[in-house]
Swiss-Prot record:
Domain of life of the organism encoding this protein: Eukaryota
Cell compartments where the protein resides: Nucleus
Alphabetized UniProt keyword annotations: Activator, Nucleus, Transcription, Transcription regulation
Intrachain disulfide bonds: none
Protein name: Mediator of RNA polymerase II transcription subunit 18
Pfam family, one: Med18
Organism: Eremothecium gossypii (strain ATCC 10895 / CBS 109.51 / FGSC 9923 / NRRL Y-1056)
Amino acid sequence: MVQQLSLYSVIDEGSFDLLIATISALSGRSPVLFANYNHVAHPNPNYAIEKVNAKNQLVEQTRVQLMQEIPFEKLQTEEYSYKLCTKMTGDGPPIETEYLNSLMRSCGDGTRPWSLSLWDIPSAGKDRKVCTQAVVESVVTSTGGAHSSILSFLAELGYVPGYQFVQLGTQFYLENGIVFQISKLWALHGESGKTSAVTKDGFLIKAYLNVPKATDLESINQGTAHLQQLKRELRDYLELSIPDRKSMDSRVGHLNDF
């Protein structure tokens, strides 16, 4: 089970170029464009699911998140660098709506793989220096059947569609293992084609790194120190902080939606 250590912040659109220049100068590296489609599903309420395990311990139902990378050729732009982020000012992402609507129903050998993950609620405590969250992740490379899709795969697992969003932005891969993301998010409202900007007039900032084992305290402490050092280096530009852990709770019945 991977432990993800992270810090978050936000900036307005006018601060984007300065932040890119700052991180480029600190790291000596160039930003990389990325785009992904995300679908969050929840357990089917029509199923009578036991809420205790074999040891009679309470087990809470959890949402699952599916993520698929969006190929750059699907972006409605001729700019395939971080500069695209400065042009994303509307209520919808620069991606074909028809393509986004088809992703959950696509099937066949040409379908791109999906990342399937479960996120635990972040660790509690007054003295936390970073957000620490356990993540279980797998890859769905294909689904069986003549008319299979990721939707039918979820249904067989006992899950039904929840909500969808698109994330598009740029990221730096820092030498100490930290991934520094600057991105925009859009919520997708079914197959109507309607979208709404979650990060309107600004960008979400996330700095994170993954530790393969929760028992590797040395790596966790080292990762925490790296994130704290980055926080100090950027204190004149933005405030990296720990979000409210309740907003990152993926358990059913807890606030976690847009």
